[in-house]
Amino acid sequence: MKTNKNIIVEGKHNKPILTDVFYLENKQPKPIVIFCHGYKGFKDWGAWNLMAETFAKAGFFFIKFNFSHNGGTIEEPIDFPDLEAFGNNNYSKELDDLGNVIDWISTNIDYQKEINLDD
């Protein structure tokens, strides 16, 4: 299984979106699952890596990410050092972040042979 962690996706609101991908590297197009964890958590919380690995082993291209205003930073992605960003977070920003992740994977040349954008 191929895992790329802490990929920085540029966000619309001047905050990076820290992203992980999990997949079986075999140059076969796979359906994409984008996991939006919610409840102001982190992409690395609890069993999320185990869940990502399970989806990847089942033949999916699995993406999980931290919302840009979840309170974490690139240097400290599993803590709350950026309380101002956390306080300014809202549903619209999270929808924008999801759109940025969709745009990023849809145009990322590195993964084009591994993802299915047609279905």
Model features per residue range: what roles?
Residues P16, F61-I63, I105:
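Generic alpha-helical hydrophobic packing signal
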